[in-house]
Amino acid sequence: MGEPAFTSFPSPPVLGKLKRNMMPWALQKKREIHMAKAHRRRAARSALPMRLTSCIFRRPVTRIRSHPDNQVRRRKGDEHLEKPQQLCAYRRLQALQPCSSQGEGSSPLHLESVLSILAPGTAGESLDRAGAERVRIPLEPTPGRFPAVAGGPTPGMGCQLPPPLSGQLVTPADIRRQARRVKKARERLAKALQADRLARQAEMLTGG
């Protein structure tokens, strides 16, 4: 008896090399989540940025400055608001009254003293002219003319200008006198600044 003939079956055609994923399932899931997030970030980055301040500032904002040419956008109710004032500093400045070198309260300068300081030789003449013109003024008001108001400007005063100060001689005594005045004024200013600083510190301590 002969040997049975060997029958071979043809193998199916191989379409490609089979690939097997060696990555664990948990790691593969994490990789898919990471890739999905990266894809969403790329899609969001490609869009134009959104102005988040448009929902806050609905009107154009202008800077407020004290200049006549500036136009500030404001509401109708803001027109009647008053500017804030520093009341404490204002009261301290009111308490600081001008005083003389002896510490006494100084009164306002009169016209005669001002003229004597500016031009000692012409003070009496200008006052005499002013007195003469005051005598000429009629007591009863005339048509088209009003009498001088009490406390107002007196006719004739200020019309006579003093001569220039270049013709006056400055002596060493005048220089020393002026230096003493400047020194006393600086001392008063230093005392006032020190009092203001102490008052500010007291306000900060009481307010805090």
From Swiss-Prot:
Disulfide bonds: none
GO MF entries: methyl-CpG binding
Signal sequence extent: none
Domain of life: Eukaryota
InterPro entries: MBD2/MBD3_p55-bd, MeCpG-bd_2/3_C_dom
GO biological process, one term: DNA methylation-dependent constitutive heterochromatin formation
Cellular component GO terms, alphabetical: nucleus
Record's miscellaneous remark: The MBD3L proteins are encoded by strongly repeated regions of the 19p13 chromosome. The exact number of functional copies is unclear, and some of them may represent pseudogenes.
Family, as annotated: Belongs to the MBD3L family.
Protein name listed in UniProt: Methyl-CpG-binding domain protein 3-like 5
